[in-house]
UniProtKB/Swiss-Prot annotation:
Molecular function in Gene Ontology: rRNA (guanine-N7-)-methyltransferase activity
Protein family per UniProt: Belongs to the methyltransferase superfamily. RNA methyltransferase RsmG family.
Record flagged with keyword Methyltransferase: yes
Coiled coil segments of this chain: none
Record's keyword terms, sorted: Cytoplasm, Methyltransferase, rRNA processing, S-adenosyl-L-methionine, Transferase
Alphabetized CDD domains for the sequence: AdoMet_MTases (cd02440)
Subcellular location(s) of the protein: Cytoplasm
Name of the featured protein: Ribosomal RNA small subunit methyltransferase G
Amino acid sequence: MSVVSNTSFEHALREGANALGLDLSEAQITQLLDFLALLQKWNKVYNLTAVRDPQEMLTHHLLDSLAAVPPLRRHVAQRGQDSAARPGARLLDVGSGGGLPGVVFAICCPEVDVSCVDTVAKKAAFIQQAAGTLGLSNLHGIHARVETLAGPFDVVSCRAFAALADFTAWSRQALAPHGVWLAMKGKHPHDEIAALPADVSVFHVEQLTVPGLQAERCILWLRPVA
């Protein structure tokens, strides 16, 4: 598979991963490039993303998603220190579309079981196809509305999906006890935070720097309040 997996893309990916402080194996680099190739190949058929240019796909999608991997890895590692927690973690990526960031999480965090849910059948089918092609047994595509999923998932993530109040309300029943939400946003969403109900708490906000992307990015970590 070599639609975009040429030397220049590999170099840009390696440089981006280094800038993010990400330690990736050769197999993971190959899987990420192959995923990018799949995304470009099937985008015309499935309409997975409005971004058509391969270079923009690398920056706006792949590196943007990779920026969230170090925070996720830290959370999973901290969770693993809890003797009561089961090994690894189950993650639900809501409104995953073409698998961003869900597929990237599955590649870079093999100890995490990732389910990507989307209401569009062909997008969920693409995730299943990507799982098979890339050899990711920890990746699953689900065609459903998130409100219908029971979980339990230790982390429920989204990227440019919906307002925080809607995201947390629609996915709350899928969250495991002591589970958390991970929301990827652009600018700090002060208004969205102010609109959250009293039983949802933002406990951490991380500013992200995406290599090659001159735009504000942040991650919000949220949890239910008893």
